[in-house]
Amino acid sequence: MSSEADRAIQANLSSEAYDHEVDVLVVGSGGGGMTAALAAKGSGLDALIVEKSAKFGGSTALSGGGVWIPGAPSQVRAGYHIDLNGVFEYLKQITGGLVSDARLHAYVDEAPKMMDFLERSSKWMQFVWKPGYADYYPELPGGSERGSTINVPEIDLRVLGPEEQNLLAPLALAPRGIWFAPKDLRLFYQVRQNWRGKAVLLKLIWRMVRAHVFGDRMAAIGQSLMARMRLALGEHNVPMWLSAPMTELITDLDGRVVGAVVERDGKPIRIRARGGVVIASGGFDHDMTWRLEHLPELNRVQEIAGSGKDWSFGNPASMGDGIRAGEKVGAAVDLLDEAWWFPAMCWPDGRLQFMLNERMMPAQFVVNGEGKRFINEAAPYMDFAHAMIEGQRAGVETIPCWLITDIRSFHKYVVGGHLPIPKVPFAPVPTGRKVPKAWLDSGIVKEANSFEELATKIGVPPAQLRATADRFNKLAAGGHDDDFNRGDSAYDNYYGDPTLPNPNLLPLGKGPYYAFQIILGDLGTSGGLRTDEHARVLREDDTVIDGLYATGNATAAVMGRSYAGAGATIGPAMTFGYVAAKHIAHQSQEVTK
């Protein structure tokens, strides 16, 4: 049979060759996938979401729920108008040439439109902007000290009805009734500095009381965002199949992706996607073999955490299935050594804890294996983690590194989840004036009465740690960090101590002193399928694989190796999900003309 005949047969495959047909098949139920499905539906196409896990929400449900959208409608409503050309220049600078101008322009131009579409599409899609959480490089041209992180209000999960049980729960469950609105957390960290911090503590107690008395099941941040998106899907009758992993992409003889095989109830289901398939299935967060292959420095993390432990905060179901499926049909991949890095503490039970506000508190510094500071401790977490990786490659142990502080800081600031208030029996977090014995027994936290003794316990040169402490204290007393400029950026100041002239600098006082071990954690991988400005997946020669789109952590990030501001993972995921759906709709219209 001639190739022309083969193509004719392939082109005229009847619906009988498939078990199910849709215009747009979306693989993955996180923020990017749900946005793609809603945008497809809004463009007059029928969409289906298939989700590998028994739970929906993906890494978005586990996240802080912020969405980085410069020029968002909520900013405009507040009278804050951003120069989008400046935002493009900001992104171009921080991505350092790794990302095409076309992709950057697409993000900057389409992100506000995406958010406007969602707000108009459903009563559940409500977004708010509260200024103050600066971009991560606010001093750069186009950066913003007021920030562009957009959030959703809290929601009572009871409105989900039976679907509540299908929402992916946070990795660390808070006590019933405890939830933080975006600005609550910052004030909570100031519980010993001002009455606003104490007011948040009282608010949390009241929320616990309400939950027990009235049955409230309130959720905020990522949980609220994904609950709202699920409600919007229901409002528009967009179906979603849970426990339905995509196992294979289907192509025609020209290499166009025309559908996928999905396993459902133990059976393979062939689904035809008339317009296209959108891969929004997340990264390969928990495929440690694959990750170690691309970043050998993670072997050191595994040595510290334990070979059987996993240091990613990403969706437990993220194993790279969508990326591999794309590769099998010819897709190129980029940035597989990258992740949304986050310095963290790893407790003996394998539980990871963010190191965020601790790195911004004033009386502390971080040292490497030589006992020296190596970065502005308050730097954005991607920068801090890259410094750890680069130091390790250079032969200086920075995985782990150690945060050095004093007992006064422990009594004054939230450190390692410890709340600096009098001992509260049966409290859900550590309280009281003593460093928990379990911390000291774990080996993750070291205690000593002098810097020299502490140095011995963490394996750094005693004389050098003393010299580093003396140098830091001298700079802190003068009010400026001449070595690393800690405290110069509005971003540094966010979780600092607002009662100090420099919120991020204060000399360490008397002992005992403490060292907290820091390793590499992450919020998920950020490398994957190579895509263009229309979210189309590309081959190695940058030609387009027709019918295949991707967004979110399944792609090589539009942020490159950087991080523009809080929400710079979810913002692009949702935006390029929207872009993909709009492009499919446009292509479908062209075909029918």
Where do the protein language model's features map onto the residues?
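Conserved N-terminal/central alpha/beta ligand/cofactor-binding core
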Residues: 2-6, 11, 52-239, 291-295, ...
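Helical element adjacent to the flavin cofactor pocket in flavoenzyme catalytic cores
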Residues: 206-275, 323
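Internal hydrophobic alpha-helix adjacent to the cofactor/substrate pocket in enzyme cavities
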Residues: 325-332, 466, 572-591
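Extreme N-terminal leader/targeting segments of oxidoreductases
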Residues: 1-24, 42, 227, 559-562, ...
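Glycine-rich loop(s) and the adjacent beta-strand/alpha-helix scaffold that form part
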Residues: 216-223, 235, 264-347, 570, ...
